[in-house]
């Protein structure tokens, strides 16, 4: 009985110890869960939990180092970022990068304001002092807006002028190139030009037994190339004759030697009249023999 009561008395103590051990295990598991949750945070969440303002960054730097570093005045923000490997690194942003500053709104000018500003720019490209103050008051603008507009307008004008100069230079270069090509082609044409053909009289060979006066009149002078018939041949009827060959044929085809009894006249039809005279003489001889 005593042993059973002692065991029953020890039971609650053991259960308490086991419960305490369970509590310690639970604390350990909870800490592990917290670490796991902390490891699952994104870099932006870690950056959000870190110093999110210049004052917070300076305070964290003062707490960690005890005094501001030598480059503390040149920076305005420090951000803690966890990379893909789980390493936490600190990123220091420069003072010139102001993330909290709102974006500047773009100034929109009305048509009347633009017309007036353009007229003033055509009159004078630099408006300063009292003129700028008066112009800003009339257009219901600030002096800074007027000054910036004039600066942008001068920059645009310089760009336009440089673009025009480039276009003129390119056009002049193309014109010079075209002119040089034309001159080169003309020079080539002058060098490759065919010489003029010599006169027909120089190409015509001299006929054997033909006087010089007949050569010039029968071949060179076109006025003497018209057909002329002798009185004897005109009396007798003759069939139509083919037209005379041009004088060029004499220069291309070889000339045959004519018999000594065959005399050339000034007309191209005299050979036919000579044949007619020969035929007539032969017929008269036959009649005489009969």
Curated annotation (Swiss-Prot):
Q: Which UniProt keywords apply?
A: Developmental protein, DNA-binding, Homeobox, Nucleus, Transcription, Transcription regulation, Wnt signaling pathway
| Biased amino acid composition, Basic and acidic residues | 1-17
Protein name per the record? Ventral anterior homeobox 2
Chain residue ranges for the region called Disordered? 1-75, 205-240
- InterPro entries cross-referenced by the UniProt entry: EMX-VAX-Noto_Homeobox_TFs, HD, HD_metazoa, Homeobox_CS, Homeodomain-like_sf, HTH_motif
Q: Which residues bind DNA?
A: 102-161
Q: Where in the cell is it found?
A: Nucleus
This entry carries the following GO cellular component terms, namely: chromatin; cytoplasm; nucleus
Query: Could you give a single Gene Ontology term from the biological process aspect?
Result: embryonic eye morphogenesis
**Claim: DNA-binding is one of the keywords in the record:** yes
UniProt xrefs under SUPFAM superfamilies = Homeodomain-like
Q: Which portions of the chain have biased composition (kind: Low complexity)?
A: 222-238
**Gene encoding the protein:** VAX2
Task: Spell out the molecular function terms from Gene Ontology.
Answer: chromatin DNA binding; DNA-binding transcription factor activity; DNA-binding transcription factor activity, RNA polymerase II-specific; DNA-binding transcription repressor activity, RNA polymerase II-specific; RNA polymerase II cis-regulatory region sequence-specific DNA binding; RNA polymerase II intronic transcription regulatory region sequence-specific DNA binding; sequence-specific double-stranded DNA binding
């Amino acid at each position: 009985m005593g042993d059973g009561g002692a065991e029953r008395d020890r039971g609650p103590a053991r259960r308490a110890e086991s419960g305490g051990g369970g509590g310690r295990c639970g604390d350990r598991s909870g800490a592990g869960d917290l670490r796991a949750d902390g490891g699952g945070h994104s870099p932006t969440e870690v950056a959000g939990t870190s110093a999110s303002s210049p004052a917070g960054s300076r305070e964290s730097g003062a707490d960690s180092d005890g005094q501001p570093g030598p480059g503390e005045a040149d920076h305005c923000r420090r951000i803690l970022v966890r990379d893909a490997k789980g390493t936490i690194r600190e990123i220091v942003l420069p003072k010139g990068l102001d993330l909290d500053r709102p974006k500047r709104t773009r100034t929109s000018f009305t048509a009347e304001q633009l017309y007036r500003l353009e007229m003033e720019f055509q009159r004078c490209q630099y408006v300063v002092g009292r003129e700028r103050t008066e112009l800003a008051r009339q257009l219901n603008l600030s002096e800074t807006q007027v000054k910036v507009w004039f600066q942008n307008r001068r920059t645009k004008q310089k760009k336009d002028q440089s673009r025009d100069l480039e276009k003129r230079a390119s056009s002049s270069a193309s014109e010079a190139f075209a002119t040089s090509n034309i001159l080169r082609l003309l020079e080539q044409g002058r060098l490759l030009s065919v010489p003029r053909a010599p006169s027909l009289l120089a190409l015509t060979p001299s006929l054997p037994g033909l006087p010089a006066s007949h050569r010039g009149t029968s071949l060179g002078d076109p006025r003497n190339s018209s057909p002329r018939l002798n009185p004897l041949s005109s009396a007798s009827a003759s069939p139509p004759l083919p037209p005379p060959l041009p004088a060029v044929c004499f220069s291309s085809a070889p000339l045959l030697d004519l018999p000594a009894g065959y005399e050339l006249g000034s007309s191209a039809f005299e050979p036919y009249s000579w044949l007619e005279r020969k035929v007539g003489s032969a017929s008269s001889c036959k009649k005489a023999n009969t």
